[in-house]
Amino acid sequence: MTVVVTVERRMKPGSLREIHRLQAELWEIASRTPGYISGETVFSASDPDRFMTLSRWESIDHWWDWENNGERHDLFEKYSGILEVTRGPRVWRTTQ
């Protein structure tokens, strides 16, 4: 069953350029990960420092593989000074 995973984050003020770079790198790595379907980053309309990622996976097991991906962990370590998770990850099942 397909799942959608959401994670809300807050970035350090003034770090939007780095966030765009991080997201581009993450989506590139995810695209090579088995089970990845799609991903998107959306930014808060009321708070410029908040954003959310939504990723779609073929199964929760595929997402767990992504969650434990070494390249992914290395990237988050690299950008840890500008990020804070505020909610998530949350896993949602689809009806399809």
Task: Enumerate the language-model features and the residues they cover.
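Generic alpha-helix initiation/capping and coil-helix boundary signal
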Residues: Q23, P34, S46-P48
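An amphipathic, aromatic/His-enriched active-site/gating alpha helix that lines ligand/cofactor pockets
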Residues: E25-S38, R56-R90
